A protein has these predicted regions:
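Non-catalytic signal-transmission and effector/linker regions of two-component phosphorelay proteins
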Residues: 1-10, 114-125
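Charged docking surfaces used in two-component/phosphorelay signaling
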Residues: 19-30
């Protein structure tokens, strides 16, 4: 059953791992959010050019265009949505990833994450 109050909020999931994208889509849709998935940052750019999203859930490491490049593009072209980004990343954080996350001040989820962790963080934003 969908949760009331989230029907008008749209979320773009930017994730190259199909299973994770589907999991996030299922959880967020169940809570009443309108959800779309982009398989990489380049596809996300195209979707952001055509549509409006209230929040982005962005994987840091992806082929074609990763989350770091997408975030830099957002800051230049879509600063409003750049403020409402949650990053996801694998459990092994290299120094470069830690530096990036620290510089953005954005929240992030370590994979694998639970549905409760995902919804809890989304609702905070």
């Amino acid at each position: 059953m969908k949760k009331p109050g989230n029907e008008e909020k749209s979320i773009l999931i930017v994730e190259d791992e199909s299973a994770i994208g589907k999991f996030c889509h299922r959880v967020l849709s169940k809570h009443g959010f309108k959800v779309n998935i982009a398989g990489n940052g380049k596809i996300a750019q195209q979707m952001l050019e055509k549509g409006k999203y209230d929040l982005l859930l962005v994987d840091i490491r992806m082929p074609v265009m990763d989350g770091v490049e997408l975030y830099r593009w957002l800051n230049k072209k879509r600063p409003q949505i750049a403020r409402r980004v949650i990053f996801t990343t694998g459990s092994v954080l290299g120094q470069e990833t830690l530096n990036f996350l620290g510089s953005t001040g954005k929240p992030f989820l370590l994979k694998p994450f639970s549905s409760d962790e995902l919804i809890g963080l989304v609702k905070k934003l």
